Swiss-Prot record:
Residues 23-148, 295-316 are annotated as: Disordered. It comes from Hypocrea jecorina (strain QM6a) (Trichoderma reesei). GO terms for biological process: sporulation resulting in formation of a cellular spore. It holds the Pfam family Velvet. Belongs to the velvet family. VelB subfamily. InterPro entries: Velvet (IPR021740), Velvet_dom (IPR037525), Velvet_dom_sf (IPR038491). Residues 295-313 have a biased composition (Polar residues). It is found in: Nucleus; Cytoplasm. Keywords: Cytoplasm, Nucleus, Sporulation, Transcription, Transcription regulation. Component of the velvet transcription factor complex that controls sexual/asexual developmental ratio in response to light, promoting sexual development in the darkness while stimulating asexual sporulation under illumination. The velvet complex acts as a global regulator for secondary metabolite gene expression. Component of the VEL2-VOS1 heterodimeric complex that plays a dual role in activating genes associated with spore maturation and repressing certain development-associated genes. This is Velvet complex subunit 2. Residues 112-131 have a biased composition (Basic and acidic residues). Residues 54-70 have a biased composition (Basic residues). Disulfide bonds: none annotated.
Length: 490
């Protein structure tokens, strides 16, 4: 058998081959075939010896360079481990954090320094990249859950103690409002909320903790006030910009709380002009008014509260923007962009504020009016419920809402009778504190086309009507065609 003659390798080629072999240990291996199993993560995380760290510029070489010169024994070392080895360590890949994997590496394992598999790192990174997203989603869920108790706490009833008498007052909305038809801005066809809200007043003796008999209580000075709030119970919506049409659309009406409109000279107050200002003296008005740039013949001012064209024509109701506390001069000199009118000092608004206040001629401007109309205060009555149990009740049978949407009613109870220190007085001439308050459930106000019909008269309403309370009782549904009819009887 002929002896094998070793190949003759020059010094330059030997040095190049050694350099390529040295670099190859630090190049990414070829991609694994489809059926191959990735390498063990514990072996892939083993730190290399210090003498094998290459310079940073070596990683910028082409990975395919010198691939065909790889020795056979190195290829054997880079074969994937058995399936059992991978399955044994797959549990650590899913649950163990990165520092634990580094500590659990086996430095004595043969070829541990050579098993640095960069594709395995690429497989490991997506699994770690998904870790922040569950934490972020969990944080958002915790934040939303923390917001729910905050909003729910606003809807909790308030029960206070009257120190002079030692009584605690509590309101219980026994009959909740369900739906109503929007009445618009005309008073001829006003439909009340059905069924009428019925609130029972419960008085507890603080000393004994028991309910006081209503026959022992003088309820002649008890008053229940009601106002309108949004469905979340975070903002009152008692004001709305009125219109001359009897059935305004939702887009032309905006509700506002009482606190957003006030009278004064501060920069946070808003005024309304009952009549359009004259052309000759557009700056003499003490209250704020604005002119449309399409009709202007001289420098004008604009605010989100109203929009009056200077030629005497008017537009439909526009939205009121309390956050815009500024005036704008379109045709005046640049020095006139900052001015003072009627005690207000402001700066020019952006163009978006004027686009929101587009003026269309044909209808006069409206004024702010109440959104909840009717009898907003009710006196107390001693009535018997359906189980013949006497109690102090407040019945609000005359409430209507001008605009459609979901709302809540807030009930506030006060005692306007004389205080303990007012001897001989019949009426409280000072302030009356709110002794109890609560919210109703959410009810919906529909437009005339979407209104499903008034609710049937409840047994409680019929019981109170039989005792002299003026509650509109629905006529027999069989005579008038069902729930869709709006006929009432007394």
């Amino acid at each position: 058998m002929p002896s094998l003659i070793p190949p003759i390798v020059s010094a330059s080629s030997a040095s190049n081959s050694a350099a390529l072999d040295h670099l190859y240990h630090h190049q990414p291996p070829p991609r694994l075939p489809l059926g191959a199993v990735p390498q063990s993560p514990i072996q892939s995380q083993a730190p290399p010896p210090p003498h094998l760290h290459p310079p940073s510029h070596h990683f910028q070489l082409h990975p395919g360079h010198g691939h065909h010169q790889q020795p056979h024994h190195e290829r054997d070392h880079r074969l994937p481990p058995p399936v059992a080895s991978y399955s044994a360590h797959s549990h650590h890949l899913q649950h163990d954090p990165l520092p634990q994997r580094l500590e659990s590496s086996q430095p004595g394992h043969p070829g541990a320094a050579e098993h640095r598999d960069h594709p395995q790192h690429a497989l490991d990174e997506p699994s770690r990249s998904h870790d922040p997203y569950p934490s972020m989603a969990t944080g958002a869920l915790v934040h939303s859950e923390s917001q729910q108790p905050a909003s729910a706490s606003l809807l909790l009833p308030i029960s206070n103690v009257e120190e002079a008498t030692g009584r605690r007052y509590h309101l219980d909305v026994v009959q909740q409002p369900r739906r109503a038809r929007m009445c618009g801005f005309g008073d001829k066809d006003r439909r009340p909320i059905t069924p009428p809200p019925c609130v029972r007043l419960i008085i507890i003796d603080v000393a004994t903790g028991k309910e006081i008999d209503c026959n022992d209580i003088d309820h002649s000075m008890f008053v229940l006030n009601v106002d309108l709030w949004n469905e979340d119970g975070t903002r009152e919506v008692n004001l709305v910009r009125s219109s001359t049409s009897s059935s305004p659309s939702v887009s032309s009406t905006v509700t506002y709380p009482y606190g957003s409109i006030s009278v004064g000279e501060s920069s946070h107050t808003y005024g309304q002009s009952a009549h359009p200002p004259s052309r000759e003296a557009p700056y003499s008005v003490s209250q704020t008014a604005s002119y449309a740039p399409e009709y202007q013949t001289q420098p004008t001012y604009s605010q989100g509260s109203s929009a009056y064209p200077s030629n005497g024509t008017y537009g439909p109701p526009q939205q009121y923007f309390p956050q815009h506390q500024a005036y704008r001069t379109e045709t005046g000199p640049p020095g006139a962009m900052q001015t003072t009118v009627g005690g207000f000092r402001g700066y020019a608004q952006d163009q978006n504020a004027l686009t929101k206040m587009a003026v269309v001629g044909g209808q006069p401007q409206g004024m702010f009016t109440r959104n909840l109309i009717g009898s907003l205060a009710a006196s107390a009555f001693r009535l018997a419920d359906t189980s013949e149990h006497l109690g102090i009740w407040f019945v609000l049978q005359d409430l209507s809402v001008r605009t459609e949407g979901p709302f809540r009613l807030r009930f506030s109870f006060v005692n306007v009778g004389p205080l303990a220190g007012q001897n001989g007085a019949k009426v409280n001439t000072g302030r009356a504190p709110i002794l109890a308050s609560c919210f109703s459930e959410v009810f919906n106000v529909y437009s005339a086309k979407k209104f499903p019909g008034v609710c049937e008269s409840t047994p409680l309403s019929k019981t109170f009507a039989a005792q002299g309370i003026k509650i509109p009782i629905r006529k027999d549904a069989n005579l008038k065609g069902g729930d869709g009819e709006d006929d009432y009887g007394d």
